[in-house]
Amino acid sequence: MGPFHQQSRERLLSQNEYSDMCFRKITNLCELGHSDRRRIFFAVKMGMALALCSVVIFLKEPLHDASKYSVWGILTVVVVFEYSVGATLVKGFNRAIGTVSAGGLALGIARLSVLSRDFEQTIIITCIFLAGFIASYSKLHPAMKPYEYAFRVFLLTFCIVLVSGNNTGDFFSTAYYRFLFIVVGATTCLVVNIFIFPIWAGEDLHKLVANNFKSVANSLEGCVNGYLQCVEYERVPSKILTYQTSDDPLYSGYRSAIQSTNQEESLLDFAIWEPPHGPYRTFNHPWKNYVKLSGAVRHCAFTVMAIHGCILSEIQAAPEKRQAFRHELQRVGNEGAKVLRLIGEKVEKMENLGPGEILNDVQRAAEELQMKIDSKSYLLVNSESWAATKEKAEAEEYEEEAHETKVIKSLSQIWDTNSSSNNQNPASGNDESQIWESTESMMLRNRETWPSVSFIGGSVVNETVYKVYESASSLSLATFASLLIEFVARLENLVNAFEELSTKADFRDPVPLNVVDQEGLWTTLMRLRRLRRYFGRS
């Protein structure tokens, strides 16, 4: 009973663990769809497109001879149907180019091989080799990267038409029905993807760029507040040190903006193909300017990344020194985040900037910070060591001048002595070079000496190390302030990129608040007047 009971218990535990694992996976799948409902609609549309295309298989009466080729329609749906409309259009275009070009070329080569009779298979094999070599080599060119799928379809269609046509003896039917069912599958994908809950890549690109503004603004504001509150990391997370995904809100904010480059490029390639829809009313909507604007945001995010590095640094400024610049640092951070959020809101609403200058407040705050640094620059350096170093340098300069004067006098005396001795003994000319060498070593003696400081304990060493770290901590505060000023300077490029986008995309002008109030009041008065007329008649 004991071993049997133990085995039953282990079997029951394993079944419970398996059921828990299945439940967790189902829960994760439900959360995946709940976080973005478009994923559910995409899956439904994919199944619908496959079902519609599969109907062709059962239509044996009108297409009795072609039913065996209907699988190409299903394969086209599986391969071409993508998440967004733009991606589907790109895949469909590449498949059409590859199919048409390969089908036409294969029919021409098939006709040539039939005329050659005895060399038919030799010509087919040679042409397949050449097509594979040329297509594979050409798609490696950087300019051909967007058409890589077209090259794959070209090779597949070219080989199938030649090989299967040679076996059946009917090249034209193979090429024709393959092209026909590919058109049916691609058309099904486009109709379902465009007219049934469409998912637009351009809209995703628009939202991604707008969210980058908010992410960088949150990181900037959080970094400034954390620095002024003397927030320190006991141990910097390894994920931050290796630039991986982390839960730190200060880190994840600017990292998401920096890491969005590849996603923006792929969305841009798809958005260019999409027809006008929603607020994007033109075929030549400036999608590239959205990516350019996001690049300007990343340029600012790099500065925020360096500002966050000041918080992660091991050498930190003293809290009392931070409080001396608290008001100015806080204002620059708040005004900079305010500008980012305002531009991000304008991008999201597709509105122009207001009549006022958007950078006035943040630039004024940066100027006040710069003036505060100038007035209290003594807090950013070790004034005692600066004064002591200056006095020491002046004393050394005075001693060096006096020493050079003595050396010159001794040189003149030595020269007179040598000249007189040379007149008495001409063979003693070799001693002159030794005298010059000893004199040169005498002049360089001060430059060759190095202050000998022992780091093996002692109060003097501790005091020296303390002063070094104190000076470095003050420089940390200066670095933080200078990075904030640099961030403000980069905002001008960001505003210029937004104005270029708003001009090309024809953003609408913002509606003044007083106009909205007047319209609301007028509408209210008209409603009251209508109510009075209604009740007066009744």
Curated annotation (Swiss-Prot):
Keywords: Coiled coil, Ion channel, Ion transport, Membrane, Transmembrane, Transmembrane helix, Transport
An MF annotation (GO) of this entry: malate transmembrane transporter activity
Gene Ontology CC annotations of this record: vacuolar membrane
Transmembrane segments: 40-60, 70-90, 96-116, 123-143, 153-173, 179-199
Protein topology in the membrane: Multi-pass membrane protein
Membrane listed as a keyword: yes
Recorded coiled-coil stretches: 357-410
Function statement: Malate transporter.
Name assigned to this protein: Aluminum-activated malate transporter 6
Source organism (scientific name): Arabidopsis thaliana (Mouse-ear cress)
